[in-house]
Amino acid sequence: ASEPAWIAVSDPQAGVQLLAHMRKMLGDSVSAFELICRAIIDLLLTGVPGHEDPMQAVHPWYVLMDVTSQGPPGSLHGPLSDALAGAQEEGLIRDALIAASGTQAARLWRMRESLAEAQLSAGGSIPHDVSVPVSRIPEFIRRADAALVATYPGIRHCAFGHVGDGNMHYNPVRPAAIAAASTPFVAP
Protein backbone atom coordinates (compact mmCIF):
# COMPACT_ATOMS: atom_id res chain seq x y z
CA ALA A 1 0.00 0.00 0.00
CA SER A 2 1.12 3.54 -0.73
CA GLU A 3 -0.39 6.83 0.46
CA PRO A 4 1.13 10.00 -1.01
CA ALA A 5 0.30 13.37 0.52
CA TRP A 6 0.90 16.95 -0.64
CA ILE A 7 1.48 19.11 2.42
CA ALA A 8 1.83 22.90 2.70
CA VAL A 9 4.39 24.22 5.19
CA SER A 10 5.53 27.73 6.04
CA ASP A 11 9.26 27.26 5.56
CA PRO A 12 12.07 24.68 5.43
CA GLN A 13 12.29 24.59 9.24
CA ALA A 14 8.66 23.48 9.44
CA GLY A 15 9.44 20.87 6.77
CA VAL A 16 12.32 19.42 8.81
CA GLN A 17 10.17 19.43 11.96
CA LEU A 18 7.37 17.74 10.04
CA LEU A 19 9.75 14.99 8.94
CA ALA A 20 10.68 14.31 12.57
CA HIS A 21 6.99 14.29 13.56
CA MET A 22 6.01 11.92 10.77
CA ARG A 23 8.87 9.54 11.51
CA LYS A 24 7.84 9.53 15.17
CA MET A 25 4.21 8.82 14.29
CA LEU A 26 4.66 6.51 11.27
CA GLY A 27 8.17 5.08 11.68
CA ASP A 28 9.76 3.37 8.72
CA SER A 29 6.60 3.61 6.64
CA VAL A 30 7.73 7.14 5.66
CA SER A 31 9.31 6.19 2.34
CA ALA A 32 9.67 9.58 0.63
CA PHE A 33 9.82 13.14 1.91
CA GLU A 34 10.45 15.83 -0.70
CA LEU A 35 10.64 19.52 0.28
CA ILE A 36 9.68 21.80 -2.64
CA CYS A 37 9.72 25.60 -2.79
CA ARG A 38 6.80 27.50 -4.32
CA ALA A 39 9.05 29.25 -6.85
CA ILE A 40 9.66 26.02 -8.75
CA ILE A 41 5.97 25.08 -8.58
CA ASP A 42 5.19 28.42 -10.25
CA LEU A 43 7.75 27.63 -12.98
CA LEU A 44 6.16 24.21 -13.44
CA LEU A 45 2.61 25.53 -13.69
CA THR A 46 3.52 28.24 -16.21
CA GLY A 47 6.12 26.37 -18.25
CA VAL A 48 5.14 22.71 -18.45
CA PRO A 49 1.70 21.85 -19.87
CA GLY A 50 -0.51 19.33 -18.15
CA HIS A 51 0.02 20.31 -14.51
CA GLU A 52 -2.34 21.98 -12.10
CA ASP A 53 -1.91 23.21 -8.55
CA PRO A 54 -3.00 20.51 -6.09
CA MET A 55 -4.22 23.16 -3.61
CA GLN A 56 -6.40 26.22 -4.08
CA ALA A 57 -4.34 28.39 -1.72
CA VAL A 58 -0.73 29.29 -2.49
CA HIS A 59 1.87 28.42 0.15
CA PRO A 60 5.62 29.16 0.26
CA TRP A 61 6.77 25.54 0.66
CA TYR A 62 5.40 22.05 0.15
CA VAL A 63 6.27 18.52 1.10
CA LEU A 64 5.48 15.56 -1.13
CA MET A 65 5.46 12.65 1.25
CA ASP A 66 4.75 8.98 0.70
CA VAL A 67 4.10 6.29 3.25
CA THR A 68 4.19 2.64 2.25
CA SER A 69 3.52 -0.74 3.81
CA GLN A 70 2.87 -4.34 2.88
CA GLY A 71 -0.73 -3.96 4.08
CA PRO A 72 -3.81 -3.80 1.87
CA PRO A 73 -4.64 -0.65 -0.10
CA GLY A 74 -6.04 2.03 2.18
CA SER A 75 -4.47 0.57 5.33
CA LEU A 76 -2.27 3.64 5.80
CA HIS A 77 -4.96 6.26 5.27
CA GLY A 78 -6.06 6.37 8.92
CA PRO A 79 -2.56 6.50 10.44
CA LEU A 80 -1.47 9.13 7.90
CA SER A 81 -4.58 11.24 8.55
CA ASP A 82 -3.98 11.03 12.30
CA ALA A 83 -0.31 11.99 11.92
CA LEU A 84 -1.23 14.97 9.74
CA ALA A 85 -3.92 16.07 12.20
CA GLY A 86 -1.32 15.98 14.97
CA ALA A 87 1.09 18.00 12.84
CA GLN A 88 -1.61 20.59 12.22
CA GLU A 89 -2.35 20.81 15.95
CA GLU A 90 1.37 21.44 16.55
CA GLY A 91 1.38 24.21 13.92
CA LEU A 92 3.75 22.35 11.60
CA ILE A 93 1.51 22.38 8.52
CA ARG A 94 -0.79 24.87 6.82
CA ASP A 95 -2.79 22.40 4.76
CA ALA A 96 -2.61 18.82 3.52
CA LEU A 97 -4.06 16.70 0.78
CA ILE A 98 -3.89 12.90 0.81
CA ALA A 99 -4.14 11.48 -2.70
CA ALA A 100 -7.69 10.23 -3.13
CA SER A 101 -6.91 7.92 -6.05
CA GLY A 102 -4.09 6.30 -7.95
CA THR A 103 -4.55 8.92 -10.65
CA GLN A 104 -4.13 11.77 -8.18
CA ALA A 105 -1.09 10.07 -6.62
CA ALA A 106 0.49 9.72 -10.07
CA ARG A 107 -0.19 13.41 -10.80
CA LEU A 108 1.57 14.46 -7.59
CA TRP A 109 4.64 12.37 -8.42
CA ARG A 110 4.61 13.55 -12.05
CA MET A 111 4.84 17.12 -10.72
CA ARG A 112 7.95 16.22 -8.74
CA GLU A 113 9.48 14.42 -11.71
CA SER A 114 8.84 17.43 -13.99
CA LEU A 115 10.72 19.99 -11.90
CA ALA A 116 13.88 19.80 -14.05
CA GLU A 117 11.79 20.45 -17.16
CA ALA A 118 10.20 23.44 -15.40
CA GLN A 119 13.61 25.00 -14.88
CA LEU A 120 14.51 24.51 -18.55
CA SER A 121 11.28 26.22 -19.58
CA ALA A 122 12.31 29.23 -17.46
CA GLY A 123 15.60 29.71 -19.29
CA GLY A 124 17.67 27.08 -17.54
CA SER A 125 19.25 26.89 -14.14
CA ILE A 126 22.59 26.32 -12.50
CA PRO A 127 21.97 22.95 -10.83
CA HIS A 128 23.58 21.96 -7.57
CA ASP A 129 23.08 18.73 -5.64
CA VAL A 130 23.99 19.59 -2.09
CA SER A 131 24.35 17.18 0.82
CA VAL A 132 23.50 18.89 4.08
CA PRO A 133 22.78 17.44 7.52
CA VAL A 134 18.99 17.33 7.78
CA SER A 135 18.97 19.70 10.77
CA ARG A 136 20.96 22.30 8.77
CA ILE A 137 18.82 22.32 5.61
CA PRO A 138 16.82 25.41 6.70
CA GLU A 139 20.00 27.33 7.51
CA PHE A 140 21.61 26.33 4.21
CA ILE A 141 18.61 27.49 2.18
CA ARG A 142 18.31 30.75 4.15
CA ARG A 143 22.01 31.61 3.76
CA ALA A 144 22.24 30.54 0.10
CA ASP A 145 19.12 32.54 -0.80
CA ALA A 146 20.47 35.65 0.95
CA ALA A 147 23.87 35.38 -0.77
CA LEU A 148 22.31 34.93 -4.21
CA VAL A 149 19.88 37.82 -3.87
CA ALA A 150 22.68 40.11 -2.64
CA THR A 151 24.87 39.25 -5.63
CA TYR A 152 22.28 38.72 -8.37
CA PRO A 153 19.18 40.87 -7.81
CA GLY A 154 16.08 39.25 -9.27
CA ILE A 155 17.52 35.74 -9.33
CA ARG A 156 14.99 33.00 -8.72
CA HIS A 157 16.18 30.35 -6.31
CA CYS A 158 14.63 26.93 -6.57
CA ALA A 159 15.22 24.45 -3.79
CA PHE A 160 13.75 20.98 -3.67
CA GLY A 161 14.89 17.56 -2.65
CA HIS A 162 15.06 14.58 -0.42
CA VAL A 163 14.97 16.01 3.09
CA GLY A 164 15.03 12.56 4.65
CA ASP A 165 18.59 11.94 3.49
CA GLY A 166 19.81 15.54 3.44
CA ASN A 167 20.14 15.78 -0.34
CA MET A 168 18.80 19.03 -1.77
CA HIS A 169 18.71 20.31 -5.32
CA TYR A 170 19.53 24.01 -5.09
CA ASN A 171 19.19 25.51 -8.54
CA PRO A 172 19.33 29.26 -9.17
CA VAL A 173 17.29 30.29 -12.22
CA ARG A 174 17.99 33.46 -14.20
CA PRO A 175 15.80 36.48 -13.46
CA ALA A 176 12.61 36.40 -15.54
CA ALA A 177 13.52 39.54 -17.55
CA ILE A 178 16.89 38.09 -18.55
CA ALA A 179 15.46 34.66 -19.31
CA ALA A 180 12.77 36.23 -21.51
CA ALA A 181 15.36 38.31 -23.40
CA SER A 182 17.68 35.31 -23.93
CA THR A 183 20.66 37.43 -22.89
CA PRO A 184 23.63 36.10 -20.96
CA PHE A 185 23.50 36.42 -17.20
CA VAL A 186 26.79 37.80 -15.92
CA ALA A 187 27.77 38.64 -12.37
CA PRO A 188 27.68 42.37 -11.62
Locations of regions flagged by a protein language model:
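Noncatalytic alpha-helical scaffold of FAD-dependent oxidoreductases
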Residues: 1-188
